[in-house]
Amino acid sequence: MKKIVFATNNAHKLQELRQMLGDRYEILGLADIGCHDDIPETADVIEDNARMKAQYVKDHFGYDCFSDDTGLEIDALNGEPGVHSARYAGPGHDSEANIDKVLKKLDGVNDRTARFRTAIALLQGDEMHMFEGQVEGMILTERHGTGGFGYDSIFQPVEGDGSTFAQMSPEQKNSISHRGRAVARLVEFLNNQQ
């Protein structure tokens, strides 16, 4: 089985990608290659963060790899939290604090349209390839479901049966999610190379 490095230490992301690619690739995380660095994510857009992480791994560890960045963009908040989604509530806060901040900022707001966007950067040799996925939805007024991670319990995709990502099985979520779509494009590209 072919090995590929995914530039993340996020166990939830690794699990999702292993579910999506595990029958074709052995997905290695940063810890698997001995990288325990806190890779900077200082760009203003998710695409550039993904590129920076892939380039960092290549420059410091020598591996071809792919990396991703995801942002939740809420229309009523002018695209916030966007590139800052993982750290929206500030340093040292977790996903629950991020959700609380979103819900507080949207209190009394009727327009709750939003989208998740994922950008995946694949660095092979000196060639960078980008793959993107997006899903439209709504931010609910309270949490629903216990699965998933991040903002999954308050995001209801337009596609589907009215469930939040946190209420869906991993297979349901991956079939319509932003990350699932970006990964599908990555897989198509990788398969065409073989």
Where are these regions (language model features)?
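Anionic-ligand binding patches
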Residues: 2-5, 11-194
